Amino acid sequence: MATSGRLLCFCLVLGLVFESLGYSEARPPRDRKRTVTAKRYDPLAQRVDCGGSPCAFGCCENDVCRELDCEYAPPFGF
């Protein structure tokens, strides 16, 4: 009976240790700044003002860094 009680306590302690180790990575704090990958997939973060008209994905019509399939995005007011 004492052995099963010790085994139960040992398993509970191991569970608490492993839960505390993985908890910080599973839920990042809410006040953390947005990461680069989150900005990459956000369409509003990729709009750039190109001479008064907003363009999608940071490409302008007369710019050197024009990308393939560059389309004008609708204005923010829609």
From Swiss-Prot:
Keyword Secreted: yes
Record's comment describing the protein's domains: The cysteine framework is VI/VII (C-C-CC-C-C).
Expression tissues: Expressed by the venom duct.
Protein family according to the UniProt entry: Belongs to the teretoxin M (TM) superfamily.
Compartment annotation: Secreted
MF terms in GO: toxin activity
Protein's name in the database: Teretoxin Tsu6.15
Signal peptide region: 1-21
Keywords in alphabetical order: Disulfide bond, Secreted, Signal, Toxin
Species, as recorded: Terebra subulata (Chocolate spotted auger)
Top-level taxonomic group: Eukaryota
Record flagged with keyword Disulfide bond: yes
Free-text description of this protein's post-translational modifications in UniProt: Contains 3 disulfide bonds.
Propeptide feature: residues: 22-47
One Gene Ontology term, aspect cellular component: extracellular region
